[in-house]
Amino acid sequence: MADNLLSEQLLQRLQDGDNKGVDTLELAAVLSVDHQQVVGAVKSLQCLGEIIEAEQRSSKKWELSSEGEEIAQVGSHEARVFQSLPKEGLLQAELMKLPFAKVGFSKAMSNKWIRLDKAAAGGPCVYRVVETIEDTVKEKLQLILKGRADDVNEKDKNELKKRKLVNEVTVKSYWVTKGSGFSTSITKQETDLTPEMIASGSWREKQFKGYNFNALGVMPECGHLHPLLKVRTQFRQIFLEMGFTEMPTNNFIESSFWNFDALFQPQQHPARDQHDTFFLQDPALATEFPMEYLERVKKVHSEGGYGSQGYKYDWSIHEAQKNILRTHTTAVSARMLYKLAHQKEFTPVKYFSIDRVFRNETLDATHLAEFHQIEGVVADRGLTLGNLMGVLKEFFHKLGITKLRFKPAYNPYTEPSMEVFSYHEGLKKWVEVGNSGLFRPELLLPMGLPGDVNVLGWGLSLERPTMIRYGIKNIRELVGHKVNLQMVYDSPICRLDAC
């Protein structure tokens, strides 16, 4: 039905209504048209001036879900289960093959329409308990379908909603009344001023449709940032606000020396196994190392030193030479701390990095072989565990995380070490959000850092907060070839506001 015909019918009803108004929902029902078509006619009339007045109203309405519509036609699952049972009964295994039996069986049992005989010959068998039933679920759904939801009490409607058979929706409609310039005759308004109108002068006698400056225009084509990049930018901004300097993280390939040995991680540690680490085939080995530093690392591993007993094993340079895809960005931190140790005079520093790391892990909904690590490092004289907790509280507060707990943990290269937990309001439980600790003397002193210098460090992944922020449950929907590009186009700006 064309908009102009609907507009004429609306005006005629106002004319015949003795100054009473017209409800667009009622008009749509009377004319058997979609409500949005009537709304379109109202909008068109509003553009003509003061012909009508329209007041927007909101009301609640109950609608059937697709499953509810099916039940309104063929009956509830429990009724169909009852009707499927012959008088002599039916094996439960056969009954459960029916598509509606999974829900219908339990409902029919709770209604005491059927019973289950587990001791029957041939296996558990289901029998009727009553001769006839009344399918009240179907009856209530049919009432709602006919627009008589008020005839169904609230308890029953909530039960139907719990079963996902109905939904309560908010419906916006208009109450239309006559305007100051009301008329039943509609003069066509021009939408374009043409060269012919100007040449002939006919534009003087024509009425032009006014511009709607509130109308939404066509969105311009532009680039879009992936949610990971948006959250990464927000994290980076937080670090910069706290006075941190970003570390260069362009080396995806690291030697095992910088990735493991320099961090006082023993060569027999399970994390260095091929089941957890990607080893390079070509070039397989690194050849350039600061040899004096390498010898000090070898000694602290095999013999101990700096107040440590070490690990007491035969340290192998061949194992340290193996090239790998870095398993953490702490390898970058190790290089930066070594560089810091060789400055003429020690100066306190605050470093951070956000970049990719690689683990040979089993892929699932929350784990990938490639992901991002966020890391913060603070080096200064006299730092303590209390300083670490203070920095962490400030950092996570800027992320909007204020409820924190710290739990003792073990890391090869930090002591003491702490896992950081935050209370998740949605899950109603404490969840791990990061790991932290003070770098061990066995890591710092071989580098050449002064003995009174302590280094705080902590890290977390980028993917987990991004998934939480954007409500993504499967990491494959965030990263990889299955990413829905529309999600990238529509994702809002990331704001990690402090509470």
Curated annotation (Swiss-Prot):
Record field: catalytic activity: tRNA(Phe) + L-phenylalanine + ATP = L-phenylalanyl-tRNA(Phe) + AMP + diphosphate + H(+)
One annotated Gene Ontology cellular component of this protein: cytoplasm
One Pfam family this sequence matches: PheRS_DBD2
Localization (cell): Cytoplasm
InterPro entries reported for this sequence: aa-tRNA-synth_II (IPR006195), aa-tRNA-synth_II/BPL/LPL (IPR045864), Phe-tRNA-synth_IIc_asu (IPR004529), Phenylalanyl-tRNA_Synthase (IPR002319), PheRS_DBD1 (IPR040724), PheRS_DBD2 (IPR040586), PheRS_DBD3 (IPR040725)
Cofactors: Mg(2+)
First-tier enzyme category under EC: ligase
Chief subcellular location: cytoplasm
EC number: 6.1.1.20
GO biological process terms, semicolon-separated: phenylalanyl-tRNA aminoacylation; protein heterotetramerization
Domain of life of the source: Eukaryota
Keywords linked to the UniProt accession: Aminoacyl-tRNA synthetase, ATP-binding, Cytoplasm, Ligase, Magnesium, Metal-binding, Nucleotide-binding, Protein biosynthesis
Gene3D superfamilies for the chain: 1.10.10.2320, 1.10.10.2330, 3.30.1370.240, Bira Bifunctional Protein, Domain 2
Entry binding sites for Mg(2+): E415
Binding site for L-phenylalanine: T330, Q373, I374, E375, Y413, F439
Sample GO molecular function, one term: phenylalanine-tRNA ligase activity
Subunit: Heterotetramer; dimer of two heterodimers formed by alpha and beta subunits.
Family designation: Belongs to the class-II aminoacyl-tRNA synthetase family. Phe-tRNA synthetase alpha subunit type 2 subfamily.
Protein name: Phenylalanine--tRNA ligase alpha subunit B
Organism: Xenopus laevis
